Amino acid sequence: MNMTQARVLVAAVVGLVAVLLYASIHKIEEGHLAVYYRGGALLTSPSGPGYHIMLPFITTFRSVQTTLQTDEVKNVPCGTSGGVMIYIDRIEVVNMLAPYAVFDIVRNYTADYDKTLIFNKIHHELNQFCSAHTLQEVYIELFDQIDENLKQALQKDLNLMAPGLTIQAVRVTKPKIPEAIRRNFELMEAEKTKLLIAAQKQKVVEKEAETERKKAVIEAEKIAQVAKIRFQQKVMEKETEKRISEIEDAAFLAREKAKADAEYYAAHKYATSNKHKLTPEYLELKKYQAIASNSKIYFGSNIPNMFVDSSCALKYSDIRTGRESSHPSKEALEPSGENLIQNKESTG
């Protein structure tokens, strides 16, 4: 064997080794697990992220995602209970496969498990829902419930068929309906919108009227309260004036009563003092003093009796008639007072 043949052989061996190494070395991305098939049989040991070596041309692998992924189901037909065929353009199913369930699910449903467990189930559940409801319910009334109903139905079946596969969310686009029906629905929605606008305007008008009524009531209540306060103020002023008048009257009455009591007490004391003071002897003394201070001389038979007592007057009358002597005796004139005797003597 010459050198040329040896070089060709070495090059062929190196190329074969390189091809074998290239075919045996593979890379697994983060968030994925690799499952291996050897001769068509699934191996029990999945591999995690990184570089791995396998027997080329004998062992094959499939990468299975274990993080959140979104599967899309497109153009799903759906027949309503009224016989109208509608199409849902796209349904998105967000799901996640747990790493511990990878081997069982791949063994039971292959690495394309989402086609069996999600796509087919979506078609079945959606047709069940549409066939039980009318177009009005599917398109308008119950459309907001389709997402949640599909999610619950899928998760319920997966809990039995494929534990470890979890449905996180389901998003359904608006169904496509026949053009004529769509226009009718649009007109109906437009009329409903107008009705809602009219109802809202009516509510606004009613609210404004209610607001005005409340404002009027509040204003009336305010006026009434102000009037009530003013009335109470006037009543209090009148009551205060009445109270002041009563106090003044009571004070005046007390003063007058005290004054009357004082006058009564003074009069009573004065009467009592006079009672004790005006004795017959004192009166007699005062009479004599009054006669003594009187400088008038009376002549004739009409001498007032107040200046002489009865016995003196009788004696004086007898003297004037001549029954007695022309000059009265000293004893007869003695009660009349000393001044009267002196006056008589001066005129005789």
Curated annotation (Swiss-Prot):
Description of post-translational modifications: Deubiquitinated by USP25; leading to stabilization.
UniProt xrefs under CDD domains: SPFH_like_u3
A matching Pfam family: Band_7
Biased composition (Polar residues): 339-348
Function (record text): Component of the ERLIN1/ERLIN2 complex which mediates the endoplasmic reticulum-associated degradation (ERAD) of inositol 1,4,5-trisphosphate receptors (IP3Rs). Involved in regulation of cellular cholesterol homeostasis by regulation the SREBP signaling pathway. Binds cholesterol and may promote ER retention of the SCAP-SREBF complex.
PANTHER family tied to this protein: ERLIN (ER LIPID RAFT ASSOCIATED PROTEIN) HOMOLOG (PTHR15351), ERLIN-1 (PTHR15351:SF2)
Residue numbers on the Cytoplasmic membrane side: 1-7
Modified residue annotations for N6-acetyllysine: K269
Upper lineage: Eukaryota, Metazoa, Chordata, Craniata, Vertebrata
Region (Disordered): 321-348
Transmembrane segments: 8-28
Cited InterPro entries: Band_7, Band_7/SPFH_dom_sf, Erlin1/2
Biased composition regions of type Basic and acidic residues, renumbered to the chain: 321-333
Protein name per the record: Erlin-1
GO annotation, cellular component aspect: endoplasmic reticulum membrane; protein-containing complex
Subcellular location per the Swiss-Prot or TrEMBL entry: Endoplasmic reticulum membrane
Glycan attachment points: N108
Keyword rRNA processing: no
UniProt keyword list: Acetylation, Cholesterol metabolism, Endoplasmic reticulum, Glycoprotein, Lipid metabolism, Lipid-binding, Membrane, Signal-anchor, Steroid metabolism, Sterol metabolism, Transmembrane, Transmembrane helix
Biological processes annotated in GO: cholesterol metabolic process; ERAD pathway; negative regulation of cholesterol biosynthetic process; negative regulation of fatty acid biosynthetic process; SREBP signaling pathway
